[in-house]
């Protein structure tokens, strides 16, 4: 089952007696919203995810759908450049990047996941064509063919 992020105070962390733990520990950042960027070598799709209220904590993945808002997000050219540079340095040709826009108006990198969730973007923004981009990339690598039909991959 899914276990989302948990807020731990520094003192609690110091008191733990666990020798090894499969976890990632990051400082808590007060956020305005989250940014998710699905990045192929030659293309990307991105969104901004914001809470409609503060009632559900800090992980939108466990909120009821009506409690968050998904909007298009236009990253800067420099941000896309840096993401591509990271993909190249990790020898990846695809990755899903997560960022937080802090209340201090700084953008904070959280992670890049080579198998991250991004297909939901098409549910909110069909014009993003992430299914099309993914299928083209899987079939053609960098040689994107706009004529490949997504329809032939749907099961009735």
Where on the chain are the PLM-derived regions?
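Homeobox/homeodomain signature
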Residues: 15-19, 84, 97
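Short loop/turn microsegments at loop-to-beta-strand junctions
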Residues: 34-35, 95-97
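C-terminal active-site "lid" helix and adjoining low-complexity regulatory extension at the edge
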Residues: 69, 73-77, 81, 85-92, ...
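Phosphate-binding site of ATP-dependent enzymes
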Residues: 1-74
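Anionic group-transfer/hydrolysis microenvironments
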Residues: 28-29, 38, 98-100, 113-115
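A short catalytic or substrate-binding loop motif that flags glycine-/basic-rich loops and adjacent residues
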Residues: 28-31, 89-93
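Protein kinase-like catalytic core scaffold
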Residues: 24, 45, 95, 108-111
